UniProtKB/Swiss-Prot annotation:
This is Peptidase T. The active site is at D84, E177. Binds 2 Zn(2+) ions per subunit. Zn(2+) 2 binds at D143, E178, H382.
Length: 407
């Protein structure tokens, strides 16, 4: 159904730069996220009359409660969205609202960029709908300002319609999800729910309880620099070591060659000189055994290269980042089945697929709160071609309301 102020909320949130900073050491990593929580979201929660509204300086989460209004609905359910946006220009976001999209090319402001169905066939799913796009110079921030707007709108609808009976609802708006550390300090005891949902998915119907298991691999290659004219038998080129290491990884296990349940090894950066070079990889897989095998392959290649040179030419550090939340959620599929049933009741076809990435729910699930992910509507996220459908956002609100009112 249509909801007053949903579009207005989203546009207002989207215009605020809340980009996170992977190089910062504070929590949240940017002051703009703190300001967004305290100056925008907290007053709105207060105006809605929620209880126990508090901002946790320890982790950057803004938390609030809407008490149950029916003693028979005893569940305590959480909804979580993140405040930060991805690593793309977020200053001066100027959304475009395209009403009754006709299926054609959408110019992104005067930037010279276009949303073209020839490049983005997913646009054909939205003919006749209201689309919100960028002006071509920034991202949109539907990931995850759409989720925040949907949660806020659901709360406002429940407060305005007390005849709708619902369980206790806890909401959490957190920082730094896009750089993978948003849930590191999540306070499970403070949030105090039976289960939760991240409202951080993509198109209509997405319902996800599987993520990658993830690790980061950092390598330092140690060379020996001598004059190239007399280098024979003496020079060890650290850049060549980095290339040799990379070439020993399976060539087919790259992101651009994988999909579905296939994992990958992704070389993110390679820098250096003859004397020293650095490579950074991310390692991703869904299954524990193959995840461990991937990490073991990295170690085996490093060991083999060091053995061949008779000394340490390759230093390798691997750090696990998060794990497939399926390991937790599949022990009790009730949160997934509940969301699935609500979607079906609303005529929405659930699209249950693995997330080829991670969510805050990955870590929160392992902390003790099962937290699958539901759609928020964003498409082509993290860049200038990002867009979201107002009608999909409305249906996300419908799903939230259905979940909290389901007996």
């Amino acid at each position: 159904m249509a909801y007053d102020l949903l579009l207005e909320r989203f546009l207002r949130y989207a215009k605020i730069n809340t980009r996170s900073d992977e190089n910062a050491t504070r929590t949240p990593t940017t002051q703009s996220q703190v300001d967004f929580a305290l100056n925008i979201l907290k007053p709105e929660l207060e105006e809605l009359g929620l209880s126990n509204i508090h901002y946790l300086e320890s982790n950057g989460y803004l938390v609030a409660t809407l008490p149950a209004n029916d003693d028979r609905l005893t569940r305590k359910i959480g909804f979580i969205s993140h405040m930060d946006t991805a690593d793309f220009n977020a200053e001066g976001v100027s959304p475009q609202v395209i009403e009754s999209y006709d299926g054609g090319i959408i110019p992104l402001g005067t930037s010279g960029y276009n949303l073209d169905p020839a490049d983005f066939p997913n646009l054909q799913n939205y003919i006749g709908q209201t689309l919100i796009t960028t002006d071509g110079t920034t991202l949109l921030g539907a990931d995850d300002k759409s989720g925040i707007a949907e949660i806020m709108t659901a709360l406002a609808h429940l407060k305005a319609n007390p005849e709708i009976k619902h369980c206790e609802i806890r909401v959490g708006f957190g920082p730094d999800e896009e750089i993978g550390i948003g849930a590191d300090k999540f306070d499970v005891d403070d949030f105090d729910v039976d289960f939760a949902y991240t409202v951080d998915g993509g198109p209509l119907g997405e319902l996800q309880y599987e993520t990658f298991s993830a690790a980061a691999a950092e390598l330092i290659f140690h060379g020996r620099n001598v004059h190239p004219g007399t280098a024979k038998g003496q020079m060890v080129n650290a850049l060549q070591l980095a290339i040799d290491f990379h070439n020993q990884l399976p060539a087919e296990d790259r992101p651009e060659l994988t999909d579905g349940y296939q994992g990958f090894n992704h070389l993110q950066t390679m820098t250096g000189t003859v004397e020293e070079a650095n490579s950074s990889y991310i390692i991703r897989d869904f299954e524990t055994e193959s995840f461990e095998n991937r990490k073991a392959t990295f170690q085996e290649i490093a060991d083999k290269m060091n053995q061949a040179y008779g000394q340490t030419r390759v230093d390798l550090v691997i750090k696990d980042q998060y794990y497939n939340m399926r390991q937790v959620i599949e022990k009790d599929m009730m949160p997934v089945e509940l969301a699935k049933e609500v979607m079906e009741d609303l005529g929405i076809v659930p699209v249950i697929e693995p997330i080829r990435g991670g969510t805050d729910g990955s870590k929160i699930s392992f902390m003790g709160i099962p937290t699958p992910n539901i759609f928020a509507g964003g498409e082509n996220m993290h860049g200038r071609y990002e867009f979201v459908s107002l009608q999909t956002m409305e249906k996300a609100v419908d799903v939230i309301l259905g979940i909290v009112s389901k007996p």
